[in-house]
Amino acid sequence: MKDPELISWTTLPNIFLVATTDSGKVVGCIAYKQVNFDTVELGRNSVDKEFRRLGIGQKLLRTILKTAKDNGYETVLVSTSIAQLHAQKLYEKMNFKFVCFKPSLFHPLFTYLTGLKAMEYKI
C-alpha cells in the first residue's frame, strides 16, 4: 500500500526528487507541492545521516528551485524549526528569508517552544 500523502506529493504539478548512489541506494529526497498558481511549498526534505555534509542537500535544493523556476513559480515556501538548525542554515545560505513564525494546529505555546517558522524564497 502506498503512502497517501506521498502520492499527493508526486502527482503533477507536484514534484518529488531523490538522490541516489551509483548502486541506486536512495540517500536523499526533496519535494514541492503547489500552493497556488505562483507558489510551491517544500517538503519531504531529507538526507541519510551517513551522506550528510557532502553537498547532497544543497544540490537537491538547487535542483528543485530550478525546477520551480522552470515551471513558472515565483515563490517557494518552507517550514522549519529550531530543532532543524542545519536545515535553517542551508535555507539561509540559499537566500531564503524568514517570513513569520508559522501558526500551527497545536497550542500557540507549542509553536513558540518549537520555533516553527516559515521561510520564503523569491525566484
What are these regions (language model features)?
Residues V47, R53-K66, E92-K93:
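Conserved acetyl-CoA-binding loop-helix of GNAT-fold acetyltransferases
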Residues D38, L54, N71-E74:
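Short coil/turn segments at alpha/beta junctions that flank glycine-rich nucleotide-binding fingerprints
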Residues M1-G43, D48, L61-R62, F101-S104, ...:
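Acetyl-CoA-dependent GNAT
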